[in-house]
């Protein structure tokens, strides 16, 4: 059996890894071993943070809605607001409610008054 020296294949594989790591800083973009390690770390982080992003945005929307609902009324909170929303069968998700609360507070007040009464 003939000996395979892997010249072309190895170069092509390393070039692919270098292109991925070209924006990394220092040895992380130049040395082959560290680029492969950093590539693995980057892929793991991106996979983890794709699911974390959904959590973070939901938390941000809830915080914004809670802040606006507590502004006017003394004993009114986010949990009561959402409970009344479901009770009245109004189909507005948290993202839309947060956008309304930020951009058009009058509209949000109309919605909350409609829910309470």
From Swiss-Prot:
Name this polypeptide is given: Large ribosomal subunit protein bL20c
First-listed, main subcellular location of the protein, grouped into a coarse class: plastid
UniProt xrefs under InterPro entries: Ribosomal_bL20 (IPR005813), RIBOSOMAL_L20_CS (IPR049946), Ribosomal_protein_bL20_C (IPR035566)
Gene coding for it: rpl20
HAMAP family from the UniProt entry: Ribosomal_bL20
Role, per record: Binds directly to 23S ribosomal RNA and is necessary for the in vitro assembly process of the 50S ribosomal subunit. It is not involved in the protein synthesizing functions of that subunit.
Keyword list, A-Z: Chloroplast, Plastid, Ribonucleoprotein, Ribosomal protein, RNA-binding, rRNA-binding
Subcellular location, record wording: Plastid, Chloroplast
Molecular function in Gene Ontology: rRNA binding; structural constituent of ribosome
């Amino acid at each position: 059996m003939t000996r395979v020296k892997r010249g072309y294949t190895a170069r092509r594989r390393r070039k692919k890894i270098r292109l991925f790591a070209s924006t990394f800083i220092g040895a992380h973009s130049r040395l082959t071993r560290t680029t492969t390690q950093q590539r693995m770390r980057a892929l793991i982080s991106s996979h983890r943070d794709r699911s974390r992003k959904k959590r973070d945005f939901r938390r941000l929307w809830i915080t914004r809605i809670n802040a606006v609902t507590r502004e006017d009324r003394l004993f009114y909170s986010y949990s009561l607001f959402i409970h009344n929303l479901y009770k009245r069968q109004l189909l507005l998700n948290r993202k839309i409610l947060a956008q309304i609360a930020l951009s058009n507070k009058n509209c949000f007040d109309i919605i909350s008054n409609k829910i309470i009464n």
